[in-house]
């Protein structure tokens, strides 16, 4: 038996209220956890972690679960990990030990969560090695792979025709796939850091791409 707690951006309209997608996939959400994140500032993030701890502690005190599963390294997850360990609930961390290029804040939060967690399920051996190097006992560290690979193996993804239709792609022209990870500690400069990439894409577009 599981109890699913949803919070953070899952509940925010600006991010698509993705809690609805969770329920649409057949998962019952036990409770929506209020983690206030009204602004994109350093103060708001710190406040959201505190709000998350307060909200999550009420739910976990009511549930008294055998263990708590926490995913990745977002601020909501950080709040959940702190709450679980402080309430003496065995915690399981998924995707610990990963490394983000550029010294992003993600690494500090992720590794802090690793030291709070009791069991670790990593996506690759290098991540497991980093956790072991932090002094975690080997029996606590399990290399299980990236969960999304299961969806790919089961072919649970949109077909190429569905992607073309949804994104209105013109297959007679080359396609550019672009992604850029912002430096989380330099969010005020994020547009200036992104602009050269946007200029490059604009230049390519001018050449008929």
How should these model regions be labeled?
Residues 1, 36-138:
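Active-site and donor-binding regions of nucleotide-sugar-utilizing enzymes
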Residues 3-48, 55:
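Conserved nucleotide-sugar phosphate-binding/catalytic loop shared by glycosyltransferases and other
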Residues 3-6, 93, 143, 178:
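Structural beta-sheet core signal
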Residues 52-59, 163, 197, 201:
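Generic hydrophobic alpha-helical segments
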Residues 199-209:
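A conserved nucleotide-sugar
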């Amino acid at each position: 038996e599981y109890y699913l707690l949803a919070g953070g951006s899952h509940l925010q309209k600006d991010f698509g209220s993705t809690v609805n997608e969770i329920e649409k996939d057949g998962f019952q959400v036990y409770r929506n956890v209020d983690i206030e994140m009204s602004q994109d500032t350093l103060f708001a993030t710190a406040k959201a972690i505190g709000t998350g701890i307060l909200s999550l502690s009420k739910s976990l005190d009511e549930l008294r679960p055998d263990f708590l599963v926490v995913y990745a390294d977002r601020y909501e997850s950080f709040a959940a990990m702190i709450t679980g360990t402080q309430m003496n609930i065995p915690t399981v961390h998924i995707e610990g030990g990963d490394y983000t290029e550029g010294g992003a804040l993600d690494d500090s939060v992720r590794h802090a969560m690793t030291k709070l967690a009791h069991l670790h399920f990593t996506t690759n051996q290098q991540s497991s090695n980093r956790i072991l190097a932090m002094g975690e006992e080997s029996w606590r560290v399990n290399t299980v792979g990236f969960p999304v690979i299961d969806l790919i193996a089961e072919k649970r993804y949109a077909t190429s025709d569905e992607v073309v239709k949804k994104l209105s792609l013109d297959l007679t022209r080359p396609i550019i796939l672009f992604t850029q990870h912002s430096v989380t500690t330099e969010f005020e400069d994020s547009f200036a850091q992104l602009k050269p990439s946007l200029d490059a894409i604009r230049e390519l577009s001018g050449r008929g791409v």
